[in-house]
Amino acid sequence: MAQAYWQCYPWLVLLCACAWSYPEPKYLGREDVRNCSTSPERLPVTAVNTTMRLAALRQQMETWNLSAYIIPDTDAHMSEYIGKPDKRREWISGFTGSAGTAVVTMGKAAVWTDSRYWTQAERQMDCNWELHKEVSISSIVAWILAEVPDGQNVGFDPFLFSVDSWKNYDQGFQDSSRHLLSVTTNLVDVAWGSERPPVPSQPIYALPKEFTGSTWQEKVSAVRSYMEHHAKTPTGVLLSALDETAWLFNLRSSDIPYNPFFYSYALLTNSSIRLFVNKSRFSLETLQYLNTNCTLPMCVQLEDYSQVRDSVKAYASGDVKILIGVSYTTYGVYEVIPKEKLVTDTYSPVMLIKAVKNSKEQALLKSSHVRDAVAVIQYLVWLEKNVPKGTVDEFSGAEYIDELRRNENFSSGPSFETISASGLNAALAHYSPTKELHRKLSSDEMYLVDSGGQYWDGTTDITRTVHWGTPTAFQKEAYTRVLMGNIDLSRLVFPAATSGRVIEAFARRALWEVGLNYGHGTGHGIGNFLCVHEWPVGFQYNNIAMAKGMFTSIEPGYYHDGEFGIRLEDVALVVEAKTKYPGDYLTFELVSFVPYDRNLIDVRLLSPEQLQYLNRYYQTIRENVGPELQRRQLLEEFAWLEQHTEPLSARAPHIISWTSLWVASALAILSWSS
């Protein structure tokens, strides 16, 4: 799944500083977006009335003597996906986009979001809200300074601000006479009242031993060893990200959409283990699993989730040093640790240790990808039969591939919202259809499906782009060049400890040669029944160096605005490279096992090395997925796989007829019965 990155250079900040608006002229006259320039104002049926919500929040602001209140789109753990109780910006503004910040003053309200969501915001917000289109913290601060008088307070919930975000806001207000005030009571929650969705209370369970790479005791020992050998010898480490506690204790639940996590913190010291969580969610069996009935170094002491700030403050009063990973720690716990007792790294030891999978974890992830490939192949076969009938749309397609995954063994649902995009919608890198808004799939258009699953043995993420008709020469070239980029990076041999950003350009080279490019990241880490976007692995500037045992996606793309989009994404394991001469070198081994669309490949563009690599990959797909299809007697899918993984050559035909598929199916049946 592609991850976008947005940045604004200094000159652009100056240009955009005042780039806020009510609906632009291009929206006027449209009934699907708001028009605040008329009297009375015209709102679409999708707009949310926020007048009473804002009044309730402003009443709380008055109680706390605040002239402005900042509402980010995060939770207390800096999660990528957030639960319903944490969708505070969505509730107060009506805007449901995944990225954006709201600020409310006593007289105005504004939302900042990027270009992916501008139209959506105009459809969902009423005229109480301004829409700002420059998303930097500096632009938010500039607006607040213009709206809030000297000497007034600007409030925020410290549990919703990362350490770095707080520093940026604090720096912005330093030279002004406004005061940035930490308020641990969330005022939106108070205004929301009884209508706020309850915090989940489903059971927290321990993963069966066969689905874990190490026991939780072994993991705790590894983290303590890391602390012991750390240059600043911390006595404890605070874990704030939800995947950290889930991984450390081999525990899972369902508090967060698409992620098997539960609200929690952990404070691990040399001699104790504290897990901050809702204790009522554990069964007696799980309590015994965690050794909660003792106080020895390998016993887990359960404390209430809400007590983490006070407990960390109490621990910090002793002769201690506390290590935190600032990327996922909020200011809410950071501010109670004296600076002389604080040890800061970008990432916690848990983040670094779990990034490198051991041999069992590698085997588990691979097995999940084999079953996942079966589901994707079933989907592609189904599409080939049904799209020409005109019976499939983007939304029904997304529902069907999710259903196919749910039917797989050890499935726990999708790993993110399926991106099912036809034609021009595929040019939007993060488009997802809805029941109300979607396009019908057509044999005359390209179709992009980016999807993934959560299984007890692994998390998956794969993107394929297909065309069932006659693609244009440009579409074939663009697709082939995206494929060339995928191959060039996947087959690359590089020195150990190389940063992903150093080699990322290999995925873009074939596109750059003809003046094409893409605007999202090239890849991200992936977990074992954890995050589909698992930091700190990947190809961006703030990712750690590549190491044997890491998993990353490789996903170049190309997006032709208003016409089509292409992305080819595979998950790869970092392995030792076999080189002619001795040396410490690495390469990638793909664990996604679904062939690319032969109808879109211009083999003439591929080098002999690229073609050889592609054919070897196809042989690997046959060896890994073929037996599973045969075992399940999925005859049609097996025939499809055999046809679509036939070796390619410069003169090989690329289009496969359904007649040939049925012939292959018959031959497969005969071979099994003999």
UniProtKB/Swiss-Prot annotation:
The keyword Metal-binding applies. InterPro entries: Creatin/AminoP/Spt16_N, Creatinase/aminopeptidase-like, Creatinase_N, Pept_M24, Pept_M24B, Peptidase_M24_C, Peptidase_M24B_aminopep-P_CS, X-Pro_aminopeptidase_P. Strongly expressed in small intestine, heart and lung. Also detected in testis, skeletal muscle, spleen, liver, kidney, brain, uterus, eye, lymph node, thymus, stomach, prostate and bone marrow. Its cofactor is Zn(2+). Glycans are attached at residues 65, 270, 278, 293. N-glycosylated. It is a lipid-anchor; GPI-anchor. GO terms for molecular function: metal ion binding; metalloaminopeptidase activity. Keywords: Aminopeptidase, Cell membrane, Glycoprotein, GPI-anchor, Hydrolase, Lipoprotein, Membrane, Metal-binding, Protease, Signal, Zinc. Homotrimer. Membrane-bound metalloprotease which catalyzes the removal of a penultimate prolyl residue from the N-termini of peptides, such as Arg-Pro-Pro. May play a role in the metabolism of the vasodilator bradykinin. This is Xaa-Pro aminopeptidase 2. The lineage of its organism: Eukaryota, Metazoa, Chordata, Craniata, Vertebrata. The gene is Xpnpep2.
